[in-house]
């Protein structure tokens, strides 16, 4: 239930931002439907935790689960608030939609054409997260929506796929779907930067930072890493500061326009991004305070659709000495790089120009089927124990692990 709740809350956020990007009320209503399922899961998990706590020691361990459950619920509620910007027509400046195409993870939609490489094939067969670095968050077939896709789901001509991921994979994605070439929304460049421009730039940054904070928070829980927990708290502080500046810029911009109504959505989006950051900090509080973590947390978070992995860079590996841009991690492996650990410090959201070195540790999140590709890029082979199912990194060309 915990892994399903995590996946559901992340799907809700993806759909909510996509609804804003495409101005699609039907997609926003799907977020409300998912919120009902998330509420049921949260209620059931709380009941299970109460029943399982039979001693003070059990209560301490279950308290950590309840803390994470509450944080996941907050993320889902923030997604609902984002969706309401569309359903309640609060207004969004068109410049924001164009700027969202420059976010670290972008929304895209494409229709599957007859005769294309996707038509009549399963999602598992197409392997979009690995092939193009984008994941399907929803499918619209005629008037029906599908949000709980399994690997055996067959794509049919006419299906409209809504995806989230690296913008670099859009061109290849459209080739696979048989769709025409896509031109991204134009971002008008103006020498004079207005308060509205500043607010929009800050909001896109808040979206990026809040999503990274959640990824790092789950990583901190799985790895029990104090350093990651501290980074999450730092990011949450940045979100607070950005929200305060954004509110000032929006007020100034509204004063200069006859109709300030399109600016209401900006304030709501900023509040939702900050709430997501607060939820991330709520999770890492457990790590920072040294609270006992129930083993189910690591198991459940590791069984989610997207897993958190830590892979070191081996000397002489394909990644050693290369910049992130030409490596194309997201499109080649499907994994999104959250941070690099170098010399005991974390470099989160590294720029494409950052050059990887032997000894760096990559902290990334993505589909489990791409884990071996990331390992190979870093000079390792991923070996799975037949009996326990545990995975181990072995240097490429090295001896097999002892059993």
Q: Model segments located where?
A:
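Cytosolic, long alpha-helical scaffolding segments
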Residues: 1-403
């Amino acid at each position: 239930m915990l892994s399903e709740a995590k996946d559901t809350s992340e799907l809700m956020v993806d759909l909510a931002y996509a609804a804003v990007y495409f101005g699609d009320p039907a997609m926003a209503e799907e977020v409300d439907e998912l919120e009902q399922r998330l509420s049921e899961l949260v209620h059931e998990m709380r009941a299970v935790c109460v029943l399982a706590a039979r001693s003070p020691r059990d209560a301490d361990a279950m308290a950590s689960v309840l803390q994470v459950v509450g944080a996941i619920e907050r993320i889902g509620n923030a997604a609902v608030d984002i969706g309401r910007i569309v359903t309640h027509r609060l207004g969004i400046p068109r410049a924001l939609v164009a700027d969202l195409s420059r976010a670290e993870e972008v929304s895209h939609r494409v229709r599957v054409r007859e005769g294309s490489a996707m038509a009549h094939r399963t999602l598992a067969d197409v392997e979009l997260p690995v092939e193009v670095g984008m994941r399907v968050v929803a499918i619209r077939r005629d008037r029906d929506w599908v949000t709980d896709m399994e690997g055996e789901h067959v794509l049919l001509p006419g299906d409209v796929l809504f995806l989230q991921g690296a913008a670099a994979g859009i061109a290849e994605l459209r080739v696979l779907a048989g769709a025409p070439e896509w031109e991204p929304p134009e971002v008008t460049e103006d020498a004079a930067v207005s308060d509205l421009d500043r607010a929009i730039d800050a909001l896109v940054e808040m979206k990026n930072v809040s999503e990274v904070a959640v990824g790092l928070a789950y990583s901190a829980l799985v790895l029990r890493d104090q350093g990651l927990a501290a980074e999450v708290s730092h990011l949450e502080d940045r979100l607070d500061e950005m929200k305060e500046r954004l509110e000032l810029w929006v007020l100034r911009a509204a004063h200069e326009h006859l109709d300030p109504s399109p600016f209401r959505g900006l304030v709501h989006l900023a509040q939702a991004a900050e709430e997501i950051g607060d939820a991330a900090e709520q999770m890492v509080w457990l790590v920072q305070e040294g609270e006992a973590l129930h083993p189910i947390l690591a198991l459940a978070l590791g069984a989610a659709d997207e897993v958190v992995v830590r892979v070191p860079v081996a000397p002489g590996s394909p990644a050693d000495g290369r910049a992130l841009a030409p490596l194309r991690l997201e499109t080649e492996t499907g994994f999104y790089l959250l941070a690099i650990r170098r010399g005991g410090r974390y470099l989160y959201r590294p720029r494409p120009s950052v050059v990887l070195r032997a000894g760096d540790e990559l902290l990334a999140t993505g589909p489990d089927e791409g884990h071996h590709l990331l390992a190979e890029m870093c000079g390792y082979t991923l070996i799975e124990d037949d009996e326990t199912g545990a995975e181990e990194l072995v240097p490429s060309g090295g001896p097999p692990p002892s059993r």
